[in-house]
């Protein structure tokens, strides 16, 4: 049977993988990990990565879900050489192959009614038999093709299907366990299992990486590929991702959508690094650059066991990348969160100045944006607990002296601000904390912030001096 290639199949490309999500919802972390493993394996061998949208479920597939999947892939920077291809645009191709299979005796029309099939199932279950089609229509082909019917694949009845799964090892399924699969529905639409086979064939897919929930589909698909005379890809079925309670990961464990992690303030590098380690590793190494992942990744090293999603580990990785990636790069992602929280970044320090200062304390970009508010806009009130502890009458004198020294500064820089704080403490004969704590509360409104010399530098001269005066008046009014 002729191959209809969608693109020139370069004979020099030894590995071509694919990611084939169904657009019935967002791109979840399980799908993202599958995409990542497929992408890494292709890149490891200088191969090609194909993106395919399996949208044959017309009732549940939506353009919004497709857009969300593409957005998630682009955010993760999982680029593809070919695609995205849509199965709904290839129905003519699938039906062409099905018609050829009927002509060659590889498939047949089935006219059995739902009532007959239900009766057959009931009889088989009553006899403790595995429910399966009895091939009633295989030799009854005198019906009109205009009558309602489905098309079934004529599955081999003898022998077994054996394949070497790259993750799970050798798997063998007896053909007696397999049914004559419906490959075209009554309405003329091809079924999922058949579309996948033709797509993998036409697209020259050499390795299929997917979730373990597809294992039962594999022997059926292999038999169809064999019947078509098509090459059999290497299959790799990865285990599920569970929550930290051992149950299948779901919304109750927190975010499961890739874009929700973006909205929650995670960098794509952190999520990619975390996902690659959910089932694969290289010794005790935890931090992997993308280049290292490509160099080291191997499907045969992927664990067969389910992985547990640990948000704390992801946060640790995210904080690492917030601190170590170039501030200019992190700023591109932080800007979205600043805008989302209605913080005008034109009214304060540059994000590249801010990131090194706040990334030590924040676990996510969302937290960092929230913590940065006092750098860009005025706050309405002081932290009440900090006021009771810090804004006592004795704080007025150090704040007043500090204000005087800061006002006299010619150059507003970290070193000069620090010297002004030191001089205030020395001249008043008090500890640095008696200066720093009320200074912090006055300028930030809270009891926690980075070092006050750096904080005041970034807050700016005018804003810092005005807040000091406001705090002095507040203390005077309290006493």
UniProtKB/Swiss-Prot annotation:
Question: Is Lipid metabolism found in the keyword set?
Answer: no
Q: Does the keyword Cytoplasm apply?
A: yes
Q: How does it assemble?
A: Monomer.
Described purpose of this protein according to its UniProt entry: Catalyzes the attachment of glutamate to tRNA(Glu) in a two-step reaction: glutamate is first activated by ATP to form Glu-AMP and then transferred to the acceptor end of tRNA(Glu).
NCBIfam families found in the cross-reference section = gltX_bact (TIGR00464)
Q: What is this protein called?
A: Glutamate--tRNA ligase
Q: Which gene encodes it?
A: gltX
Q: Which CDD domains match?
A: GluRS_core
GO molecular function list: ATP binding; glutamate-tRNA ligase activity; tRNA binding; zinc ion binding
Residues engaged in binding ATP: 251
Q: Where is this motif: 'HIGH' region?
A: 21-31
Query: What HAMAP family does the database record attribute to this sequence?
Result: Glu_tRNA_synth_type1
Which family is annotated?
Belongs to the class-I aminoacyl-tRNA synthetase family. Glutamate--tRNA ligase type 1 subfamily.
GO biological process terms, alphabetically, are: glutamyl-tRNA aminoacylation
Q: Which keywords are on file for this protein?
A: Aminoacyl-tRNA synthetase, ATP-binding, Cytoplasm, Ligase, Nucleotide-binding, Protein biosynthesis
Kindly give the Pfam families that the UniProt entry links to this protein. Anticodon_2, tRNA-synt_1c
Catalytic activity entry: tRNA(Glu) + L-glutamate + ATP = L-glutamyl-tRNA(Glu) + AMP + diphosphate
**Subcellular localization, as worded in the UniProt entry:** Cytoplasm
Q: Which domain of life is it from?
A: Bacteria
Q: What is the lineage of its organism?
A: Bacteria, Pseudomonadati, Pseudomonadota, Gammaproteobacteria, Pasteurellales
* Record EC number: 6.1.1.17
């Amino acid at each position: 049977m002729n191959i209809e290639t969608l693109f020139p199949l370069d004979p020099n490309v030894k590995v071509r993988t694919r990611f084939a999500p169904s657009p019935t919802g967002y791109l979840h972390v399980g799908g993202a990990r599958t995409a990542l493993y497929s992408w890494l394996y292709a890149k490891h061998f200088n191969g090609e990565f194909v993106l395919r949208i399996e949208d044959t479920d017309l009732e549940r597939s939506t353009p919004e879900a497709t857009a969300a999947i593409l957005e998630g892939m682009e955010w993760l920077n999982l680029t593809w050489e070919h695609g995205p291809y849509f199965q709904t645009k290839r129905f003519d191709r699938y039906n062409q192959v099905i018609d050829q299979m009927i002509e060659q005796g590889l498939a047949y029309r089935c006219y059995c009614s739902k009532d007959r099939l239900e009766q057959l199932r009931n009889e088989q279950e009553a006899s403790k038999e595995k429910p399966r089609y009895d091939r009633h229509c295989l030799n009854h082909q005198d019906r009109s093709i205009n009558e309602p019917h489905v098309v079934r694949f004529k599955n081999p009845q003898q022998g077994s299907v054996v394949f070497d799964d790259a993750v799970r090892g050798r798997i063998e399924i007896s053909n007696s366990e397999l049914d004559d699969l419906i490959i075209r529905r009554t309405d003329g639409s091809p079924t999922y299992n058949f579309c996948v086979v033709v797509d993998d064939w036409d697209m020259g897919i050499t390795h299929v990486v997917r979730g373990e929930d597809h294992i039962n589909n594999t022997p059926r698909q292999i038999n169809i590929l064999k019947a078509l005379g098509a090459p059999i890809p290497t299959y790799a079925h990865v285990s599920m991702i569970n929550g930290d309670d051992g149950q299948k990961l779901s919304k109750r464990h927190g975010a499961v959508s890739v874009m929700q992690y973006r909205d929650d303030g995670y960098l794509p590098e952190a999520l990619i690094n975390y996902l690659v380690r959910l089932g694969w590793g290289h010794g005790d190494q935890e931090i992997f650059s993308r280049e290292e992942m490509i160099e080291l990744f191997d499907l045969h090293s992927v664990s067969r066991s389910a992985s547990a999603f640990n948000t704390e580990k992801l946060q640790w990785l995210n904080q690492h990348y917030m601190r170590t990636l170039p501030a200019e790069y992190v700023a591109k992602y932080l800007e979205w969160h600043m805008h989302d929280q209605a913080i005008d970044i034109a009214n304060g320090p540059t994000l590249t100045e801010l990131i090194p200062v706040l990334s030590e304390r924040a676990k996510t970009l969302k937290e960092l944006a929230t913590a940065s508010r006092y750098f860009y806009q005025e706050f309405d009130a002081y932290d009440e607990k900090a006021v009771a502890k810090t804004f006592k009458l004795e704080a007025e004198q150090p704040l007043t002296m500090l204000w005087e020294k800061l006002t006299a500064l010619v150059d507003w820089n970290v070193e000069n601000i620090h010297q002004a704080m030191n001089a205030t403490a020395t001249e008043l004969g008090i500890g640095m904390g008696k200066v720093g704590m009320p200074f912090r509360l006055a300028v930030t409104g809270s009891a926690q912030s980075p070092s006050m010399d750096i904080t005041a530098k970034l807050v700016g001269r005018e804003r810092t001096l005005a807040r000091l005066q406001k705090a002095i008046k507040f203390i005077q009014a309290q006493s």
